[in-house]
Amino acid sequence: MGPKKSTKMSLNAFLGDESFGSTNWADDIDDLPALPQDRTTSTYRATPSSADAGYNAPSSTFESVRSPPESRREGGMGSGYQRDAIPIPSEPPFTAHVGNLSFDLTENDLGDFFGEGVTSIRLVIDPLTERSRGFGYVEFETADTLSAALALSGEDLMGRPVRITVAEPRRSFAREERSTGDWVRRGPLPPAEPAESPFGKRRTNSGRFRDPARDPSDRVREEPREWVRRGPLPPRESSERPRLNLKPRSSSNVNTEATPSATTTTSSKPKRDPFGGAKPVDNTSVLQRVEEKLAKRTQSFRREDNANRERSTSRKPSADKAEKTDKTDAIAEKVSDIRLGDGEKKSSETDSEVAATKTPATEDAPATNAGEAEEEEGWTKIGKGRKH
């Protein structure tokens, strides 16, 4: 038989089984013994002359001071920056700052904690969560009640050690009233600061920096100026335009009583004419002539048009008559040709005999009679040699 298959185990089952050992390394470290370590605070101190002494000045000193065990805070927070205690004020308001409060704490709970002598309680509340932010201010009646409340610092309140200190007074931001006054400077400007190079102070041969404004080799030096007005302001010129004194054109005395100075000025500086000395021209007569010419032309055009129309109408009936006569002549010629073709065969022999016996007078008479007979029947005889 083959080897047995090993059973599979999930990761959670492996981690949860204590037979394989502890998986939390922090628990192993907590079991090891540890020596207490002293916490120290550092202070940085710089000599006042190190900023202007150059490279030869001693550098700043770094001191490490071991904090005494009495200055350590209670509650496992360790030692931190020790702020100077604010003295108890001698005048009201006597306000204490209370910190490290529970977020579920109310003003009534805080009043019960301090007891009597409390005038007002103000908890700082978060506007989003509408819960306490963990600190507040309590105002007392006298300085003695405030000092008694400071003795309660470190006491347990709802599972937290309370931290009580004297509240700092409100800072007064006194600003100048700039809405009133005449905005006039009282006195000269303060002296200007010496100009500095964009690369900082210059270094001399002695190894120290010097101010470039104090260098005697500098060419440009700024002298202090005092912006003080010497005397009153000049009067302002009127912004209004002078009014024009117009005189009537019909006054004849203006030209006669003209002063010689005025004549000299006008003669020396003649006025410019924008039209170049041109005079107005009367164009009415020219326009009338042009209109008459145009009327004559239109009349002549109308006459020629009417004559052309009359000629075209008179030519049409004569042409129609000529066409009709041409058609009738052609028809009569065809008919005569047919008749002549039939009669030539029958009377060829008789015609020759009659022609020999007939005289010229007798030949004309039957011809006329034959023509009249044909006209009565509606036929006309046309000779063979006629061409159309």
Swiss-Prot record:
- Phosphothreonine: modified positions: 61
**SUPFAM superfamilies named among the record's database cross-references:** RNA-binding domain, RBD
> What segments bear the compositional bias annotation Polar residues?
38-50, 248-257
The record's InterPro entries line, in alphabetical order, gives: EIF-4B_RRM, Nucleotide-bd_a/b_plait_sf, RBD_domain_sf, RRM_dom
The record's subcellular locations are: Cytoplasm
Q: Which residues form the RRM domain?
A: 94-169
Q: Which GO terms describe its biological process?
A: cytoplasmic translational initiation; eukaryotic translation initiation factor 4F complex assembly; formation of translation preinitiation complex
Any one annotated GO CC term: nucleolus
Q: Compositional bias (Low complexity) at which positions?
A: 258-268
Q: Which GO terms describe its molecular function?
A: ribosomal small subunit binding; RNA binding; RNA strand annealing activity; RNA strand-exchange activity; translation initiation factor activity
Going by the UniProt record, its keywords in alphabetical order are: Cytoplasm, Phosphoprotein, RNA-binding
Q: Compositionally biased, Basic and acidic residues: which spans?
A: 171-185, 208-229, 289-349
List the residue ranges of the region (Disordered): 18-84, 171-388
4Fe-4S: present as a keyword of the record? no
Classification via Pfam families = RRM_1 (PF00076)
Q: Any idea which residues bear Phosphoserine here?
A: 49-50, 60, 64, 67, 71, 197, 250-252, 347
Q: Is NAD one of the keywords?
A: no
Its recorded name reads Probable RNA-binding protein sce3
- What is the native source organism of this protein? Schizosaccharomyces pombe (strain 972 / ATCC 24843) (Fission yeast)
